[in-house]
Amino acid sequence: AELFERFGLAGFERTPPAELSGGMRQRVAFLRTLIAGKPLLALDEPFAALDAITRGEMQGWLAAALEADPRTVVLVTHDVEEALYLSDRVLVLSPRPAGVVAELRGPVPRAPDRDATVTRPDFVSIRERALQALRQG
């Protein structure tokens, strides 16, 4: 019950998955993954199906969850801000065949509020470097 509360799911313990919002279904998936106790999380476009507002909220939620329960995460995403906000280290890949064209460090420390982080000058600078690397790919 305490995990449901921590994951923002209190009161929905017996709710069928089809009745949960997209963000809630994502939190259930992360809860299952964290309960498994694996030291490595592999996340492939975890927020791609969510609307922009829910995606930002879920990114902030995941950052806080990983701060509370640190794990190594391999995150695959096409969203540059998402990669930089959620990661300590970002590898920018070229088109097929994939090769590393740049390695960037995410902003540390991250503000608990995602919007406060992605508007900071250091974040904007890193984002511009990532976009430039993608363009040059």
Region annotations inferred by a language model:
Residues 1-12, 64:
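Conserved ABC ATPase "signature" region
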Residues 14-16, 114:
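Interfacial catalytic loop of ABC nucleotide-binding domains
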Residues 16-20, 24:
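Conserved ABC ATPase signature
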Residues 30:
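Hydrophobic anchor residue at the start of the ABC signature
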Residues 35-39:
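A short, proline-enriched helix->beta-strand linker immediately N-terminal to the Walker B motif
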Residues 41-45:
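Catalytic Walker B motif of ABC-type/P-loop ATPase nucleotide-binding domains
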Residues 55-70:
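Helical segment within the ABC ATPase nucleotide-binding domain
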